[in-house]
Design a protein with these regions (language model features):
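N-terminal leader/linker segments that precede catalytic domains of diphosphate-processing enzymes
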Residues: 1-136
């Protein structure tokens, strides 16, 4: 399947999202879980990706006491309020469960990076402000 290039500058603000890179050590070396998105998906259909997705309203509406303060601090983003930081962890756990049936403990997630989809033309007309987490 060929990916179509979006030729327009994207003016919408990026949506907060979370992605999990699941890693495990194996005798033959490091293994990484990638999933193939459904071809009809509106974002990167047919492409291999890490499990993840945008924050749902429920992620913010129901703050969880399961996210330790040390993990919120680990995001190292002074401008990020505690409720949104906790929601990012919850979204990472929820999306991993929804997309591949793996139930992660919040404490197993470690912040790795933050990527924001550019406004310039690219492979999608949607923008995301994604926090990447590693779980091993």
């Amino acid at each position: 399947m060929a990916i179509e290039i979006n030729n327009e500058v994207v003016h919408t603000p990026p949506l907060p999202s979370a992605t999990v890179m699941l890693l495990r050590d194996a005798p033959e070396g490091l293994q990484v879980l990638l999933m193939r998105r459904h071809a009809a998906s509106g974002v990167l259909g047919g492409v291999h990706v890490f499990p993840g997705g945008k924050l749902d309203p429920d992620d913010l509406a129901h703050p969880s006491p399961d996210v330790p303060a040390a993990l919120l601090t680990a995001l190292a983003e002074p401008a990020l309020d505690a409720a949104t930081a906790a929601a990012l962890y919850l979204a990472a756990v929820r999306e991993t469960w929804e997309e591949c049936g793996l139930r992660l403990d919040v404490a197993s997630l470690w912040p790795w990076s933050r990527w924001i989809t550019p406004r310039q033309p690219s492979v999608t007309n949607k923008r995301f402000d994604t926090r990447f987490f590693v779980a091993a």
